[in-house]
C-alpha cells in the first residue's frame, strides 16, 4: 500500500497561480477565474491504484494501468477521502450518512478533485484559447484508439 501512496505523492505536479477564462456557450457568457497554486496528479486515476486503495476491482481487473472509467462523482470523492486517510491526511470531503449531502473542508489538506476552473487552467498549460495541442499527440480518442481504452501516460503531455 505504501508503494501506491508514494506513487501518488511523487506523481503530483505543482500548478502555479494564474487566471483562466471560462465560458458557457449555452448562455453565451464568459468570465475569468483567479486560480491559486495547487497540486494535480500527473496521470488520471488507474484501475490498479483504485483497487489498491479501495479493494474494489473494476470490471474484474485489478492490475491495469488503464484509466478508471464509469464511476460516479460520489465514488470519486470517496476514493479521494480514502486515499487521504491512508496517506495520513485530513479528508477534504464530508459526506452525510445518507450520502446525499457533501461539503468541502477547504482548510484541510486531503486529496480532492480539481474544480472546473482548475481543470481548464491545467489543461491549457499556459496556452490561450480553447485548444490544448495536437489531439493525435496528446489524447486517445475513437479514431486513434480502435475504440479501446488505453494505458495512461502513453501520449505526450499537453505542456
Regions found by a protein language model. Name each.
Residues 4-59, 67-84, 122:
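A short glycine-rich, aromatic-capped structural motif
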Residues 62, 73-159:
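Functional-site microenvironments in short loops/helix caps that host divalent-cation chemistry
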Residues 1-4, 58, 93, 153:
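N-terminal intrinsically disordered, low-complexity tails enriched in polar/charged
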Residues 1-8, 99-102:
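A short, compositionally biased domain-edge/stem linker segment
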Amino acid at each position: 500500500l505504501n508503494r501506491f501512496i508514494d506513487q501518488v505523492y511523487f506523481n503530483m505536479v505543482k500548478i502555479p497561480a494564474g487566471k483562466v477564462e471560462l465560458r458557457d456557450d449555452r448562455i453565451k457568457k464568459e468570465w475569468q477565474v483567479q486560480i491559486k497554486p495547487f497540486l494535480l496528479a500527473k496521470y488520471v486515476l488507474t484501475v490498479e491504484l483504485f483497487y489498491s486503495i479501495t479493494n474494489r476491482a473494476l470490471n474484474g481487473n485489478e492490475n491495469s494501468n488503464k484509466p478508471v472509467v464509469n464511476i460516479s462523482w460520489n465514488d470519486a470523492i470517496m476514493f479521494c477521502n480514502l486515499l487521504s486517510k491512508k496517506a495520513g491526511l485530513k479528508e477534504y470531503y464530508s459526506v452525510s450518512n445518507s450520502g446525499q449531502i457533501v461539503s468541502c473542508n477547504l482548510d484541510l489538506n486531503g486529496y480532492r478533485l480539481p474544480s472546473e476552473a482548475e481543470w481548464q487552467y491545467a489543461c491549457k498549460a499556459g496556452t490561450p484559447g480553447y485548444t490544448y495541442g495536437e489531439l493525435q499527440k496528446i489524447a486517445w480518442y475513437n479514431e486513434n484508439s480502435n475504440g479501446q481504452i488505453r494505458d495512461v501516460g502513453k501520449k505526450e503531455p499537453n505542456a
